[in-house]
């Protein structure tokens, strides 16, 4: 929390004996809260937190929810809350004894990596990470950046700022770490802190990959130095990154600690859920909850009502990329009994007009069938441009086939020439 303060701006308060944490979601302007920490039923204080969120013009969004916490929420709020369990934020927990011994066939590749390291670098040694050695760690991290073309990615820069804050308050934060040398050259370091009486959390691990087996070696050596009362090592989440997931699974976790997220829904949000379930029956309920707890924004949902009932909707999702601001139209749906009345086309035109007023360069959408392609051509959309839609939480705005996603476009500015493909990032 302290180390990542610059990105998340985390604040805390005590409310009726519970610790409440408030932060910026993914470093954006949107506010989120962690599940309150304390003894008893935390849902009793949620009206106060909901009021705090409303004062900032936000719905209540809760993160880090345990399975027991989810049961309390469902019992108290029912359909007024959307709940989703993202695989990408699950923590990987390993038995410390497994990472020390590395016994069994499934750990043979790790033993091979370590044996290779021992064979190639007989002059290696390991020692605890102490504050007088921090400058060496910083130099290794800088070299790590240079080897990857520099720390230009915002995520990497944010991690570096967090690393520096950790080093500045290393002892005060109760951090413990280890350093691996070959000769007098630092080749890897790691550090973390105790989560509870029996679990140690690994915050960071950096290594010079020019040294074969270096990650396997620092992993084992640090696990060896932890006290016997440490039963589990928490190596945190994989963020949905395929390579990171593969690496974490290769150490055979004892279990994954799943964490749910929730958002409180207004009547419009509940109407979105009902309409989605009625019109897109092939989508699993979990997909709808993923959308509602993730990229869904009530202010970006356009609807049509008949006698007070929401019968049609379409969503504007803002993206940017290739030097352009693109309005992506998503989730266009009309209840079967109300189709053929021009509701969908009027919603699309309404969103196009909004995008024009708000300075978008173009509007894009993916037509799921040939008949829909014909429908959207009549509304001024054209072409089939390969499109890649990136979001912080990995939500799939396409068809499920990343390479097969083709977008139809409608330029909104004179002289705009659209590229032969689009790589777009979600705007917060």
Please tell me what each predicted stretch does.
Residues 69-83, 239-256, 361, 369-394:
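Conserved active-site alpha-helix within GNAT-family acetyltransferase domains
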Residues 33-41, 203-212, 329-340:
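A short, internal acetyl-CoA/4′-phosphopantetheine-binding micro-motif in the GNAT/acyltransferase core
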Residues 205-267:
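C-terminal appended segment following the main domain
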């Amino acid at each position: 929390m302290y180390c990542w303060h610059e990105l998340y701006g985390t604040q805390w308060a005590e409310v009726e004996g519970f610790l409440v944490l408030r932060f910026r979601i993914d470093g954006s302007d949107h506010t989120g809260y962690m599940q309150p920490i304390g003894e008893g039923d935390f849902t009793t204080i949620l009206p106060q937190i909901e009021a705090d969120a409303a004062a900032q013009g936000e719905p209540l969004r809760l993160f880090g929810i345990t399975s027991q916490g989810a049961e309390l929420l469902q019992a108290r709020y029912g359909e007024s809350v959307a709940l989703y369990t993202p695989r990408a934020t699950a923590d990987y927990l390993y038995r410390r004894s497994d990472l020390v011994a590395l016994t069994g066939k499934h750990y043979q590749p790790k033993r091979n990596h370590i044996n290779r390291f021992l064979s190639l670098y007989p002059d290696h040694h390991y020692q605890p990470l102490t504050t007088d050695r921090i400058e060496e760690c910083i130099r290794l991290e800088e070299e790590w950046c240079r080897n990857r073309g520099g720390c230009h990615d915002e995520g990497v820069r944010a991690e570096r700022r967090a690393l520096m804050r950790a080093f500045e308050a290393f002892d005060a934060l109760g951090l413990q770490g280890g350093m691996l040398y070959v000769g007098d050259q630092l080749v890897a370091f790691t550090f973390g802190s105790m989560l509870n009486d029996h679990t140690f959390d690994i915050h960071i691990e950096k290594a010079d990959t020019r040294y074969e087996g270096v990650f396997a070696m620092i992993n084992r050596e640090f696990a060896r130095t932890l006290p016997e009362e440490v039963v589990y090592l928490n190596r945190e989440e994989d963020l949905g990154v395929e390579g990171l997931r593969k690496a974490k699974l290769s150490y055979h976790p004892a279990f994954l600690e799943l964490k749910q997220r929730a958002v409180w829904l207004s009547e419009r949000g509940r109407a979105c859920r009902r309409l989605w379930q009625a019109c897109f029956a092939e989508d699993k309920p979990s997909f709808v909850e993923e959308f509602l707890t993730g990229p869904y924004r009530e202010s970006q949902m356009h609807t049509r009502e008949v006698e007070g009932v929401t019968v049609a909707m379409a969503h504007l999702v803002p993206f940017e990329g290739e030097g352009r601001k693109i309005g992506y139209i998503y989730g266009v749906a009309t209840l079967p009994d109300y189709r053929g009345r021009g509701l969908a086309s009027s919603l699309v035109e309404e969103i196009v007009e909004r995008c024009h007023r708000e300075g978008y360069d173009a509007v894009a959408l993916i037509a799921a069938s040939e008949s829909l392609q014909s429908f959207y051509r009549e509304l001024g959309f054209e072409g089939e441009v390969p499109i890649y839609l990136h979001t912080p939480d990995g939500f799939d705005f396409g068809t499920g086939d990343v390479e097969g996603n083709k977008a139809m476009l409608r330029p909104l500015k004179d002289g705009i020439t659209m590229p032969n493909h689009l790589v777009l990032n979600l705007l917060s």
